């Protein structure tokens, strides 16, 4: 069975394969990032989004994989065989987990459409012969200048005060935003 874990998100294994393996941070760094940004939502018993669910599943798979690796390390006597297993896990399984975690964390951080646009842009860039492409690869955190990011459900703020109000001479204080689960 050929299952593509990105299909329901509008991406594909092939699309992510354009990114070189050293592009993806270590699993430890990705887990730290997921925990720092989305711990509350990931630990919540409530469903937040398919991306949160996918991150949970990837974390569970990684934990199981590490349990297996520990067992192999303790029970396989032949050092050469042990090294082969560890190398396979790090090269193949580790990369798949890193790709999954990176994709879903990025979708939560930058929004899915931006990540998909980035993957397509990078794919076009990497397949263009070096003589014909810009020297620098596209960067995910660089959004086009025309992009406007607004929270859902909120109307845009007025840019000018109403004519009846007088402007205060003192600077305005910003309201502190309360930290809520980012679902």
UniProtKB/Swiss-Prot annotation:
Pfam families: Hepatitis_core. The keyword Calcium does not apply. Residues 143-183 are annotated as: Disordered. Phosphorylated by host SRPK1, SRPK2, and maybe protein kinase C or GAPDH. Phosphorylation is critical for pregenomic RNA packaging. Protein kinase C phosphorylation is stimulated by HBx protein and may play a role in transport of the viral genome to the nucleus at the late step during the viral replication cycle. InterPro entries: Hepatitis_core (IPR002006), Viral_capsid_core_dom_sf_HBV (IPR036459). It is found in: Virion; Host cytoplasm. Keywords: Capsid protein, Cytoplasmic inwards viral transport, DNA-binding, Host cytoplasm, Host-virus interaction, Microtubular inwards viral transport, Phosphoprotein, Repeat, RNA-binding, T=4 icosahedral capsid protein, Viral penetration into host nucleus, Virion, Virus entry into host cell. A motif (Bipartite nuclear localization signal) lies at residues 158-175. Sequence repeats lie at residues 155-161, 162-169, 170-177. GO terms for molecular function: DNA binding; RNA binding; structural molecule activity. GO terms for cellular component: host cell; host cell cytoplasm; T=4 icosahedral viral capsid. Residues 155-177 are annotated as: 3 X 8 AA repeats of S-P-R-R-R-[PR]-S-Q. One of its GO terms (biological process) is viral penetration into host nucleus. Gene3D superfamilies: Viral capsid, core domain supefamily, Hepatitis B virus. It comes from the Viruses. The modification Phosphoserine is found at residues 155, 162, 170. Residues 177-183 are annotated as: RNA binding. Belongs to the orthohepadnavirus core antigen family. Self assembles to form an icosahedral capsid. Most capsids appear to be large particles with an icosahedral symmetry of T=4 and consist of 240 copies of capsid protein, though a fraction forms smaller T=3 particles consisting of 180 capsid proteins. Entering capsids are transported along microtubules to the nucleus. Phosphorylation of the capsid is thought to induce exposure of nuclear localization signal in the C-terminal portion of the capsid protein that allows binding to the nuclear pore complex via the importin (karyopherin-) alpha and beta. Homodimerizes, then multimerizes. Interacts with cytosol exposed regions of viral L glycoprotein present in the reticulum-to-Golgi compartment. Interacts with human FLNB. Phosphorylated form interacts with host importin alpha; this interaction depends on the exposure of the NLS, which itself depends upon genome maturation and/or phosphorylation of the capsid protein. Interacts with host NUP153. This is Capsid protein. The gene is C.
């Amino acid at each position: 069975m050929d299952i593509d874990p990105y299909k329901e998100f509008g991406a594909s294994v092939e699309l992510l394969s354009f990114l070189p393996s050293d592009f993806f941070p270590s699993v430890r760094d990705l887990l730290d990032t997921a925990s720092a940004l989305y711990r509350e939502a990931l630990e919540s018993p409530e469903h937040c989004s398919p991306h949160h669910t996918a991150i949970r599943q990837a974390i569970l798979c990684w934990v199981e994989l590490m349990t297996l690796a520990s067992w192999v390390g303790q029970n396989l006597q032949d050092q050469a065989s042990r090294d082969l297993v560890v190398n396979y896990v790090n090269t193949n399984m580790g990369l798949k987990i890193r790709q999954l975690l990176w994709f879903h964390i990025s979708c939560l951080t930058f929004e899915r459409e931006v990540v998909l646009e980035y993957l397509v842009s990078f794919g076009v860039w990497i397949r263009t012969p070096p003589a014909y492409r810009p020297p620098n690869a596209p960067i995910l955190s660089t959004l086009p200048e025309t992009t406007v990011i607004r929270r859902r459900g909120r109307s845009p703020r007025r840019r000018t005060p109403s004519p009846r109000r007088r402007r205060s001479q003192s600077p305005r204080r910003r309201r502190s935003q309360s930290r809520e689960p980012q679902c």
